[in-house]
Regions:
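Residue(s) in the substrate-gating loop at a strand-loop-helix junction
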Residues: 143
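Conserved glycine-rich Rossmann-like NAD(P)H-binding loop of the short-chain dehydrogenase/reductase
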Residues: 31-48
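Substrate-binding pocket helix/loop in short-chain dehydrogenase/reductase
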Residues: 100-101, 105-110
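The beta1-alpha1 cofactor-binding region of Rossmann-like NAD(H)/NADP(H)-dependent oxidoreductases
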Residues: 42-43, 63-74, 106
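Conserved glycine-rich cofactor-binding loop
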Residues: 10, 17-18
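SDR active-site lid
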Residues: 176-240
Length: 284
C-alpha cells in the first residue's frame, strides 16, 4: 500500500485542546495538513490555532461538545466550508474514571460512554459522506483498555472496547469505497486525561494514578500515530507496554489479569470518592 501523504489534506482532530489531541494536531500540521481543532474548551483550541498559524500552518479552531450530534455536524460543515474538504477524522476526545464498580454511580459510566464512544460515533456519522467522497481516513484513539481488562476503570474499558467493535465493523462497510480505518491503542500517556479522571461520585479523583511501565509523552505517541496513519495501519499498538499487554493478554490471559490487578489494585483501596448508599453491617 502506498504511503499516504497529508500535505494539503484537511484533518479534523477532536479533543485537540491539550494533551494527545493537541500533539496529534501539531504532528499532522508538521506534515503539511490543514488542521480543524475541535474541543469543548474554546480557549484551548484558539491557543492551538494561534500556535500553528505562527508556524505558517492553516488551522481552524472550533468549540464543540462531541456528546451533541448537532454540534459535531456543525463542526464538520465548518471544516468543509473553510477548507473545501475533509480527508482525515481523528476521534481523540475522551475522559476516564478511576473507581471500582461497587463505588461508582452509574451516571459516571454513562458520561464516559457518551464522550468516549458516542462522541466518536457522532463525529464519524457527520463526516462519513465527505470521507467517502475523498477516500479518506478515520483514526480512532483507543487504549490498551480497548483489548484488555483494566481494574478500577470498568466504564472506561467498556467505552474503548466499544470503539473496536464499532470501527472494525465500519471498516468492512467503507473499505470498498476506499476509506481506511485505523485503531490506535496507546498505553499510559502523561496527559491530563487521568489527572482529570472522575471518581465514583462524579467528582475529580483525589488519589494519584498508578501506571504500568513508563508513561509515554504526548509528542512521542502522536508521532507514532501519524506515522502509522501514513502507512495505512489497521491496528497501531503505541508503546512497548501496549505491545506487551497485547501479547500476554492473548497468550496467557489469566496471567495478564493477575499481573495487571496486582499492580493496579491499589486504585481500589486508595481512598477513592465513594457513592455507596448502604453500609455493610458487621457480622455478629
Amino acid at each position: 500500500m502506498p504511503r499516504r501523504s497529508f500535505n494539503g489534506a484537511t484533518v479534523l482532530v477532536t479533543g485537540a485542546g491539550g494533551g494527545l489531541g493537541r500533539a496529534i494536531a501539531e504532528q499532522f500540521a508538521a506534515a503539511g495538513a490543514h488542521i480543524v481543532a475541535v474541543d469543548k474548551d474554546a480557549a484551548a483550541v484558539a491557543s492551538l490555532q494561534a500556535t500553528l498559524e505562527a508556524r505558517g500552518r492553516a488551522c481552524l479552531s472550533l468549540p464543540c461538545d462531541v456528546t451533541d450530534p448537532d454540534a459535531c455536524a456543525r463542526a464538520v460543515a465548518a471544516a468543509i466550508e473553510r477548507f473545501g474538504a475533509l480527508d482525515v477524522l481523528v476521534n481523540n476526545a475522551g475522559m476516564s474514571h478511576r473507581s471500582g464498580l461497587a463505588d461508582t454511580d452509574l451516571a459516571v459510566i454513562r458520561r464516559v460512554m457518551e464522550v468516549n464512544f458516542f462522541g466518536a460515533v457522532h463525529c464519524t456519522k457527520a463526516a462519513l459522506p465527505c470521507l467517502i467522497e475523498r477516500r479518506g481516513l478515520v483514526v480512532a484513539i483507543s487504549s490498551v483498555a480497548g483489548y484488555t481488562p483494566l481494574i478500577a476503570r470498568t466504564g472506561y474499558a467498556a467505552s474503548k472496547h466499544a470503539l473496536h467493535g464499532f470501527f472494525e465493523s465500519l471498516r468492512t462497510e467503507v473499505a470498498p469505497q476506499g476509506v481506511q480505518v485505523m485503531m490506535a491503542c496507546p498505553s499510559f500517556i502523561a496527559t491530563q486525561i487521568d489527572r482529570n479522571a472522575l471518581g465514583g461520585d462524579g467528582l475529580p479523583v483525589r488519589h494519584a494514578q498508578v501506571t504500568i511501565g513508563r508513561p509515554l509523552t504526548a509528542d512521542a505517541a502522536a508521532q507514532q500515530i501519524v506515522a502509522g496513519a501514513a502507512r495505512g495501519r489497521r491496528l497501531l499498538l503505541v508503546g512497548r507496554t501496549a505491545w506487551l499487554a497485547w501479547w500476554v493478554s492473548r497468550l496467557a490471559p489469566a496471567v495478564y489479569e493477575r499481573l495487571m490487578a496486582r499492580r493496579l489494585r491499589g486504585e481500589l483501596e486508595s481512598g477513592t470518592n465513594t457513592v455507596r448508599t448502604t453500609e455493610r453491617k458487621p457480622r455478629p
